[in-house]
């Protein structure tokens, strides 16, 4: 992926603005909170996975999923949902692969949000 990431490939900005009642500043404020909090949620999921704690993994993935919904990041949302399901079922070997995907998607979302915060919404 090149350095000028297409934010629309990672974020559904139309849906994001709809959820924020068209308020770009509100969305950007929520994005700032997401940038601070989501690494903690992802780290909690990874820690639960390392402890082989399916219940803890499901809880951490569920919390991350709730945050992701507000950002309208569809690929990350699907990965977080899958991680939660695998944690609930105790399928931790597969969950390890999905957790890595969540971490990759999260990094992409963070990059897109930082670009959005500094460069603004596309016109």
Describe the residue ranges of each PLM region.
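Two-component system phosphorelay core
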Residues: 1-123
């Amino acid at each position: 992926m090149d350095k000028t990431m297409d934010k629309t490939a990672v974020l559904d900005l139309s849906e994001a603005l709809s959820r924020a009642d068209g308020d770009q500043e509100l969305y950007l404020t929520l994005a700032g909170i997401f940038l601070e909090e989501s690494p903690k949620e992802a780290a909690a999921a990874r820690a639960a996975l390392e402890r082989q704690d399916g219940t803890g993994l499901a809880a951490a993935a569920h919390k991350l999923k709730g945050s992701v919904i507000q950002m309208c990041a569809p690929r990350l949302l699907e990965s977080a949902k899958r991680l939660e399901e695998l944690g609930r079922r105790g399928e931790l070997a597969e969950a390890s692969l999905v957790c890595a995907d969540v971490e990759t998607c999260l990094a992409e979302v963070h990059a897109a949000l930082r670009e959005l915060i500094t460069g603004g919404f596309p016109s």
